[in-house]
Amino acid sequence: MYSKGLTVYFVEKCDIIASVYEKGDIGKFMSVKDLTTYEVLKDEDLKGIKAKGKLLKHKKSGARVLLVENDDNNKVFSIAFRTPPSDSTGVPHIMEHSVLCGSKNFPAKDPFVELVKGSLNTFLNAMTYPDKTVYPVASCNDKDFQNLMHVYMDAVLYPNIYNHDKTFRQEGWSYKLDEKDGELSYNGVVYNEMKGAFSSPEGVLDRVVLNTLFPDNCYANESGGDPEVIPQLTYEQFLDFHRTYYHPSNSYIYLYGDMDMEEKLRWLDEEYLCHYDKKDVNSEIHLQKPFDEVQEKTFEYSIASDESTEENTFLSYNKVIGTTLDRELYQAFEILDYALLSAPGAPLKKALTDAGIGKDIMGSYDNGVYQPIFSVVAKNAEESQKDEFVKVIEDVLRDQVKNGINQKALLAGINYNEFRYREADFGNYPKGLMYGLQIMDSWLYDENQPFIHIEALETFAFLKNKVGTGYYEELIQKYLLDNTHGAIVVVRPEQGRTARLDAQLQDKLQKYKESLSNAEVEKLVADTKALEEYQSEPEVIENLEKIPVLRREDISREIAPFFNEEMKLADVPVVYHEIETNGIGYVNVMFDLSGVSAEELADVGILQSVLGIIDTENYEYSELFNEINVNTGGIGTSLELYNNVTRVKEKEFKATFEIKGKALYSQLEKTFAMMAEILTASKLDDTKRIREILAMLKSRLIMKFQSSGHTTAALRALSYASPSAKFKDMTSGIDFYKRVAYIEEHFDEEKEALSQRLYALTKKIFRPDNMMISYTAAREGLEGMEPRIAELAGRLNHEKVTETPCIIHCEKKNEGFKTASKVQYVARTGNFIDRGVEYTGALQILKVILSYDYLWQNIRVKGGAYGCMSSFNRIGEGYFVSYRDPNLKRTIDVYEGVVDYLENFTVSDRDMTKYIIGTISNMDQPMTPATKGERSMNLYMNKVSAEMIKKERAQILDAAQEDIRALAKVAKAVLAADQLCVIGGEEKIEEDKELFGDVTSF
């Protein structure tokens, strides 16, 4: 997995829930001072995260070790290495993939996948950054956690990469020639992954900005790998990289949570670190010398041959902001990013939008590299607007310095960031993982300063005190206006660039093949065959058995509890979830959409996108956003869908318009007041603002389709037969995009009618008799809720309205959507219940088996795709999908082979147990207070009973091989639906266009 800065994209195991620290004893910190093999360098009380921290160094090997102990049982271990790339061959990235493909003590071909299949991990992955490579694991089970640590330490220090070159050729790159007279090509998992990454214009922009700002240090090179350069990497260079950087002296070892730290340190020393002597590793990240003047560079990205170049250019303004070792500056620019750029109506965003420069103004502050970068980006602009773009930005910045930044915006930014810090809810990721990654923002560059960013309470206090003092204005002057270490980067479209480069590559490979002797060509064929044979060889049983596996008996049969208490407050139905939340109330106000017609659904999607970022009767939209973030932890809207699992054959579902907020109990009154303001007082006749939002929405939808093409394609294919999937597609998918694009392109004719329709929808939807509330809090958080709910209900529409039943018609289309990408997202879907096959808990095991065995081996390992997934749910929907896949027809053939694979499914009892444990691992993720409430409400709305969950769990824990073989009929039913949607390269889709009923471009 490749990552730029702090943005992490997970393709494999990604549905992980974080664990939240509540109250507990942090005084039982380990007595590591008695361990003579380590030197204690720092010992700190980390009050901000309620933990104790110790910085150590292993005396013999020079390994840096950081311990963070609290009572969080979601334990985290990671080992990281500083890995500055010297070129763009992607060797750090290829190494990250390769070391997880077998090691001295765990010689199986893919221990990583074996762990995914058979451990209770709450996180398991690895990430390549521009200057480091990180290998983190997490688990709540002590035995499992130790197993994960063992496999990962062995992988990074004793990988099998030295035994043969097949892992390098599989994960990195290799020549592929199936027969002597065939076409020569490149293949490799990383090679294909980066072809996908380089197909996105946002990806191109991120990379060229980094390379432009730092021409003289490691950031000038592409650590993930440039597909044009990856094939220059030799096997010996690959091995040299490991010899150089993968040594304990260049490592950063991190342990977090509730565990016996002394025991872990002894184990690390005795099993691994004591076998190494200290070594000088030249991996220092050098500072880039500042420029004498701002640089200007222009690059190209590819669009489809029939796509317009008009309003398709990216303009970016980028400045380097000190270093990440400046504690206050590191956080201060997060606040400035909010106040100047990211918040709706922020001055930079508003000025550029008003000037007509770009349809979507974005920005970022990347403090995940040594020298952070502040960026302003105008998407869907014209290259000719570059000079005006720079002028508008700098005029706004000068005005902010002269007249002062909006103090409420600064306070809102500080409160927003501090609330997130104190809440410590990282959604799908363990808290300890995210702390560990943030620690690396300073520790990597100064081995004596690991804690400066996770111990942030003093920093927030400092930043609050600086509001109104001129501090922030001085930062703008120094780091943005007077700073010459910057770059104006233009990324402009080129029609058919992908096809042109592919033709050049094919010509180059053909000429290379022609230059070879017959013997050399035959060797390429033999090497291709040898790699395929290696990939197809069954694992040696003895090697697999070296990977530790828990027993079924280690798994509890108990299910996680529900927290649903029905009540009425102010005559409004409330489902209350009594959970300790550290004084935060999580409110979700839900409005039924069953009275909205199918023809109105796109407008509902637009309404959801508009509310909260448009003026209201009492606030300009920028003031509204600041008012919310000064007083609460945030308010947002969404459209949700709940399938009734007791009426599957009737395809019954309930859709809702939801507005969610979170705040300290003392601020809940304000939260409800702001919700009422958004729902009842928004100025939906502000057509100028609606036009801006539609342009932004169109841009963001395209970005989503490009970055998450697998989910988009799966949803679209499901929508051919599923009313609930069709609903989602009409409100957030491809169908919705088409409607948004049409209205945006014909806005002058559409605007008045659209405004009227949006107002009418607010009257139809936002009614007290159409409302229910989900509320998560401790019992004391119920106090005062009734009058708050009554006040909200009182402001809603009480007039009678005409409701129209939502009748959705589905139609099978089998579409291919052409893009300028070099890879495909191939989705095949169907409903097995429609074909007479019932749901069983064993289908959750099937998802693990297919995603990490049959599909993994055939689509990723042999096919070179980056990812592959499958899913089967309670309402009968099943899908197979690939991610960043160089193939199309071949992948569909792999899907067709699932039935035969399952009919002949035979594994050992040990492997069967492993699949079951991996399945339970996905189900038993630790939950934050917020996610406990959300899970309870989702089960309530979907009519899923505790008995259903218990039955499903028992079916999983008691499953045998014959239960998996019986699922062949499920796969057969899904494939029989013959529902196909592919998003991918125009050449590949045109090549296989006979597969589709319709081929079109976005």
Regions found by a protein language model. Name each.
Residues T89-C101, Q608-S609:
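Active-site recognition of the HExxH zinc-binding catalytic motif
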